């Protein structure tokens, strides 16, 4: 850069960090169509996780099946490897975000979160769900209730023209009522990406964020609650359109 500036002494220079990212922030109709296909692949991956999650199954064996399903995709179209590697958060490994899987078997009494995704021609869609082996504790059920209610509040607040910080506040009000705390952000713009990250580094759903949600933005809302010795996650990838938002995945 210094050599370029020295060679053009009469030019004026302005910072353009993330310029292309902000252009990518608003998706075309063709991109939305591609992300809908990625959403269908994410559904396939999560169904594979759901069907294969059994006590005694090794995490690595389950992840092998999940990864294969991501690449096989659907009968109509195949998938790519998502920009964020798929995650199994089991037991104490679920106390923090983004752990790698291992060769430990899934155990009775564990809470296991799956943070997966679908990718179609490098367009990524995230999807997270949580299962529990056995009878869930009152704390887990209460946290689950808060997270599900919080997701509904976020979806009600997320629409073209909304302020990102206001969307986060809708979540925070629910969390406050339950007496729970989450210090990290709850969502970000997602789209075309390569490893190691599928986020676009533009919009973030966090306090005081003043970015306006535009028409045809796509946001991965990830509600991860990581406790002292367990954790859970629920996520949806949402398309901001019209007067609200719609899910790009259809999974219970």
Show the residue positions of the predicted features.
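Active-site neighborhoods and metal-handling regions in enzymes and metal-associated proteins
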Residues: 1-252
């Amino acid at each position: 850069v210094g050599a370029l500036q020295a060679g053009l002494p009469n030019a004026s220079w302005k910072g353009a960090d993330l310029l292309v990212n902000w252009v990518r922030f608003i998706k075309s109709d063709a991109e939305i169509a591609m992300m809908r296909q990625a959403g269908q692949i994410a559904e396939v991956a999560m169904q594979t996780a759901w069907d294969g999650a059994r006590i005694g199954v090794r995490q690595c064996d389950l992840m092998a099946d999940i990864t294969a399903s991501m690449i096989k995709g659907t009968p109509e179209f195949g998938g790519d490897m998502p920009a964020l590697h798929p995650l199994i958060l089991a037991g104490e490994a679920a106390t923090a975000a983004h752990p790698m899987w291992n060769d430990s078997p899934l155990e009775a009494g564990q809470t296991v979160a799956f943070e997966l995704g679908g990718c179609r021609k490098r367009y990524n869609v995230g999807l997270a769900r949580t299962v529990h082996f056995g009878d869930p504790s009152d704390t887990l059920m209460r946290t689950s209730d808060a997270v599900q209610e919080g997701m509904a509040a976020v979806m009600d607040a997320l629409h073209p023209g909304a302020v990102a910080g206001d969307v986060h506040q809708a979540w925070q009000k629910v969390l406050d009522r339950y007496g729970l705390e989450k210090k990290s952000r709850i969502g970000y713009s997602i789209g075309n990406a390569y490893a190691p990250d599928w986020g676009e580094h533009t919009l973030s759903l966090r306090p005081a964020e003043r970015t306006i949600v535009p028409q045809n933005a796509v946001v991965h809302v990830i509600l991860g609650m990581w406790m002292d010795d367990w954790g859970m996650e629920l996520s949806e990838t949402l398309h901001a359109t019209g007067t609200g938002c719609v899910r790009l995945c259809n999974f219970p």
